[in-house]
């Protein structure tokens, strides 16, 4: 049935209105946008008819890696015949990236899915917000090109604009009355869409923390924590133990729990919480996987090319081993299907922003890692790539939010690189002149070269980085902030890269 008064302009205007009126981390500090506690979300869910009770769920928290694990797991579950909802945040270009549905392959499960080229909500071709990008499967640091992908590789649909518009119009007064945050609104939207589309299971990623996160009204079949590192300390605590405790708040009574990576400080926290909830607890880094002999092969072939994905892959395969013990997930025993689905996660799930090649010549790689733990992995991989002698120079486009641990990041940044430091549209971003000052102070104090260019916008920064191409095969990296990745990706998409 057509949505009353819907048009693309009406959709964009309504979304912008909601975004401006309700607090979100994109435009205000986390402390102002984050509403700890579940009361508002529980009330909103009741008003929506408790949609999250109409399907099974898997809950994922963690400082780093939860988006990758969520997308890999959703890809696998859909490949074995389940209709899978996937809720992640933030989005990179299109708001609707936050809520996706992955369909089973139609040729294998004709009674479970429509054609992989059809949107289950609209009957139209699935939405793609990114044009085809030149990629090479021969390189470990690049993703495969579209022509190298299986014909049914694209099986993901974004929540339709019409649905978003109707939802925001229908429940706008309730959103005001309940004094919701933007994240609570998007969580309710995703939960209801999944119910309306009759998904079998939804993979739900927390927004921030776990215990008091809006998504924590669900009782999942499996609770997963990917990793713990220092981030959002003002809200979650200043120690690894405190942050682990907040994340472990997603453990539920009698629900199995899986931890991807633990540290000496965090393992006792997880063990204590699992004991309280009566949850069987598995540490992925300690177990022998049923697909252990295929691990390295899968890692080499994955279209998620960051070397840090090794940890996430082990977490996903551990989750598969736990879930396949129950009837709903028995299809996960099909190892070839599981392997293929993981290998093609980025293409099947429409997943972007993780060691993604935005351009081939010169090679431009982008990653949304933004805290010291994530950036250490990024910078280490860049240095290994440079050590091969294949690239003439390293150019890094960098921006940072004002609340991030810049003092912890500066020592990790590659020494021999040219830096293009920039500002962002977000009011949370550290102004470029402040970033440049602190960068220079650290470099001079450490006796390191201080090759930098300062720009005011992401678009200007990308143009500057490309202008530094010496024609001898430079390597360009864009990172430090999700918002930088969003603005840079928009730049490349608008120019057809």
What are these regions (language model features)?
Residues 1-62, 69-82, 87:
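Short functional linear segments
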Residues 71-109, 152-170:
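N-terminal phosphate/diphosphate-binding loop that engages ATP/GTP or pyrophosphate donors
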Residues 73, 211-221, 489-491:
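Short Gly/Thr/Asp-enriched flexible loops that form oxyanion-binding sites at enzyme active sites
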Residues 173-208:
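Phosphate-binding/switch loop-helix module in NTP-utilizing enzymes
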Residues 196, 201-206, 213-224, 228-232, ...:
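Nucleotide phosphate-binding/pyrophosphate-handling subdomain across enzymes
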Residues 263-282, 291, 363-365, 407-475:
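C-terminal helical cap/extension that packs against the catalytic core
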């Amino acid at each position: 049935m057509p949505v009353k008064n819907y048009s693309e302009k009406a959709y964009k205007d309504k979304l912008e209105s909601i975004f401006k009126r309700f607090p979100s981390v994109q435009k205000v500090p986390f402390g102002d946008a984050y509403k700890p506690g579940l009361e508002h979300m529980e009330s909103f869910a009741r008003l929506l008819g408790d949609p999250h009770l109409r399907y099974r769920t898997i809950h994922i928290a963690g400082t780093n890696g939860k988006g990758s694990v969520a997308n890999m797991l959703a890809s696998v579950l859909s490949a074995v015949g389940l209709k899978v909802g996937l809720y992640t945040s933030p989005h990179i270009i299109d708001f609707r990236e936050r809520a996706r549905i992955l369909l089973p392959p139609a040729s294998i499960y004709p009674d479970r899915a429509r054609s992989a080229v059809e949107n289950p909500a609209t009957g139209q071709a699935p939405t793609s917000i990114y044009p085809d990008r030149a990629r090479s499967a021969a390189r470990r640091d690049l993703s495969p090109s579209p022509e190298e992908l299986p014909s049914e590789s694209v099986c993901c649909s974004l929540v339709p604009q019409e649905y978003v518009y109707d939802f925001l119009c229908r429940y706008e007064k309730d959103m005001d009355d309940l004094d919701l945050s933007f994240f609570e609104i998007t969580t309710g939207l995703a939960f209801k869409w999944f119910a309306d589309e009759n998904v079998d299971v939804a993979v739900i990623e927390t927004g921030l923390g776990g215990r008091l996160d809006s998504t924590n009204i669900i009782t999942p079949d499996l609770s997963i924590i990917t990793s713990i590192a220092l981030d959002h300390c003002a809200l979650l605590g200043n120690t690894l133990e405190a942050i682990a405790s907040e994340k472990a708040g997603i453990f539920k009574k009698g629900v199995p729990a899986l931890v991807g990576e633990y540290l000496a400080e965090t393992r006792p926290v997880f063990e204590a919480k699992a004991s309280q909830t009566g949850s069987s607890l598995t540490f992925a880094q300690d177990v022998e996987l049923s697909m252990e002999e295929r691990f390295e092969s899968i890692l080499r072939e994955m279209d998620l090319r960051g070397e840090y994905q090794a940890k996430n892959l082990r977490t996903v395969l551990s989750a598969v081993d736990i879930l396949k013990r129950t009837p709903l997930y028995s299809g996960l025993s099909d190892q070839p299907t599981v392997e293929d689905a993981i290998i093609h996660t980025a293409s099947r799930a429409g997943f972007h922003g993780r060691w993604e090649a935005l351009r081939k010549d010169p090679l431009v790689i982008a990653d949304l890692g933004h805290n010291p733990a994530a950036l250490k992995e990024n910078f280490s991989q860049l240095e290994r790539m440079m050590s091969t002698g294949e690239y003439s120079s390293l150019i890094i486009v960098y921006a940072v939010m004002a609340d991030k641990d810049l003092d912890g990041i500066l020592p990790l940044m590659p020494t021999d690189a040219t830096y293009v430091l920039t500002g962002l549209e977000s009011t949370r971003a550290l102004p470029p002149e402040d970033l440049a000052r602190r960068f220079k102070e650290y470099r001079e104090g450490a006796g390191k070269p201080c090759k930098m260019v300062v720009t005011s916008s992401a678009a200007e920064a990308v143009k500057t980085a490309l202008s530094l191409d010496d024609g001898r095969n430079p390597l360009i990296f864009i990172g430090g902030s999700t918002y930088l990745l969003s603005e840079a990706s928009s730049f490349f998409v608008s120019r057809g890269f």
